[in-house]
């Protein structure tokens, strides 16, 4: 199987320096949301027709984007104003905006408890400002916070262990935070490569896939604790997505501008697909096995089908 280029979607031009960041798909409405950080927007794409629909404005420094299909919610981390927003996915109506911490970025959600973990990058000039905040979405309040051992990157939630897993850039770790005790870390996994960055979960296979700035893809088995090197990457990565339909892992590498595709069962590299220099983020529409790479130099999205 391989990624076949279907075409490109024109997106709004950048209003200032920067480009795109995290993206996510709401599968019921076929809406694809991507943080357009340079515009303080989230751009909305119809993933069924591959058309740009509109932009959601006023999300200063939009960085993290996450969708809960279970609750039809859209979450954004607004790094430029230290807030998170909660919107109705599919309709894009803002329901809540809340202070979360300093420079929020990574997001993960427990749909059964309605708990949103926010990874706050922090400010080097402010001590203990790299934190993880836990927000009770139903109560609309922060219910816990923990100081992290370093700058956080992305995060995921695992239903079986009822825990959040969060990348720390330096020291290179993945930390575990139980949803029931959000003010403390339970466990730390030491990564064999520098700069854990992108993170995603294979819930059936029980593996976390961590893409590290040291150009390595690392897998952590959540049941056994085994840590293994999956393979070398084409360069320093950013976003990682796991596709459960095909058991493929997609890693966006901005320099030189490629997607590295791995087989999650055999733990091997399948192919490397050129995108565009600077294309460090992507999204996956699982129903159609589509992969979207966001191209900052030309403010477009490249659409691929994994087939």
Where are the regions that the model predicts?
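Predominantly soluble domains enriched in secretory-pathway, periplasmic, or organellar proteins
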Residues: 1-307
């Amino acid at each position: 199987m391989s990624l076949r280029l279907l075409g490109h979607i024109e997106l709004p031009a950048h209003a200032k320096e920067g480009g795109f960041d995290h993206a996510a798909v709401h599968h019921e409405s076929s809406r694809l949301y991507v943080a357009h950080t340079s515009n303080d927007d989230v751009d909305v794409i119809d993933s069924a027709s591959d058309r740009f629909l509109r932009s959601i404005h006023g999300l200063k420094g939009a960085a993290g984007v996450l969708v809960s299909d279970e609750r039809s919610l859209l979450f954004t981390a607004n790094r430029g104003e230290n807030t998170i927003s909660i919107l109705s996915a599919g309709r894009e109506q803002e329901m809540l905006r809340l202070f979360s911490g300093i420079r929020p970025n990574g997001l993960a959600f427990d749909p059964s408890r309605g708990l949103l973990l926010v990874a706050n990058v922090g400010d080097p000039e402010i001590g203990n400002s790299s934190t993880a905040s836990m927000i009770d979405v139903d109560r609309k309040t922060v219910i816990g916070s923990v100081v992290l051992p370093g700058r956080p990157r992305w995060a995921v939630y695992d239903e079986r262990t009822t825990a959040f897993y969060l990348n720390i850039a330096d020291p290179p770790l993945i930390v575990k935070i139980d949803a029931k005790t959000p003010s403390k870390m339970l466990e730390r996994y030491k990564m064999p490569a520098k700069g854990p960055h992108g993170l995603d979960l294979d819930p059936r296979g029980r593996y976390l896939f961590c893409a590290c700035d040291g150009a390595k893809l690392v897998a952590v088995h959540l049941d056994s604790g085994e840590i293994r090197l999956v393979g070398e990457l084409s360069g320093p990565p950013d976003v990682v997505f796991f596709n459960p339909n095909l058991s493929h892992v997609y890693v966006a590498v901005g320099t030189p501008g490629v997607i590295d595709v791995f087989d999650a069962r055999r733990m091997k590299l399948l192919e490397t697909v050129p995108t565009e220099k600077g294309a460090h983020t992507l999204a996956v529409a699982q129903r159609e096995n589509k992969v979207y790479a966001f191209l900052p130099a030309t403010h477009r999205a490249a659409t691929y089908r994994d087939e």
